[in-house]
Amino acid sequence: MIRRMSSSIKEKNKRILVVDDEVDVLDFLKIYLESLGWEVTTISSTADAFIELEKKPYFLVLTDIAMPEMDGYEFISKIKDKNIPSQMALMTGFGYNPKHTLVKIYKTIRYPCLFKPFNRAKIAEAVQTAYDTYHEDLISGNKSPTEPDSQS
């Protein structure tokens, strides 16, 4: 079941920044996530994404791993270095293979990883989890929203 954003969270940050060099992916995610009630900005380069992140806060940065100017891992690392308070999620076109290096890395860094072609329910679940974690962390003050969850 795909859960729509609850009306009680409308006053909180519900902005998602999607970074991918593929226009079709950006268009799909914008249309789909906006249909669920999220505010979505799409950007095709990491350089432009950093400019956008300085303008306003996003609770989630959803980034492709393989991009021409900077890969998703380096991009996330730089976001953390700049102390930008956002949750992160990765996307990859490699598809899910439990033996693939990307899956092993994903389990190590503990950021959600969405595999292309996308499963809509998994996208909705990953976004809602990131949203809940972001706002819980801000309220509790226990950790920076840029830090991945330390539990398995």
Q: Language-model segments: which ranges?
A:
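Hydrophobic/aromatic residues positioned on beta-strands within the core alpha/beta folds
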Residues: 91-93
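Non-catalytic signal-transmission and effector/linker regions of two-component phosphorelay proteins
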Residues: 1-15, 121-152
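Receiver (REC) domain active-site loop signature in two-component systems and cognate sites
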Residues: 67
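Acidic, metal-coordinating helix/loop segments flanking the phosphotransfer/catalytic sites
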Residues: 42-60
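A Lys-centered signature of the CheY-like receiver
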Residues: 116
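Active-site residues of response regulator receiver
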Residues: 20, 64
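Two-component/phosphorelay signaling modules centered on CheY-like receiver
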Residues: 23-41, 108
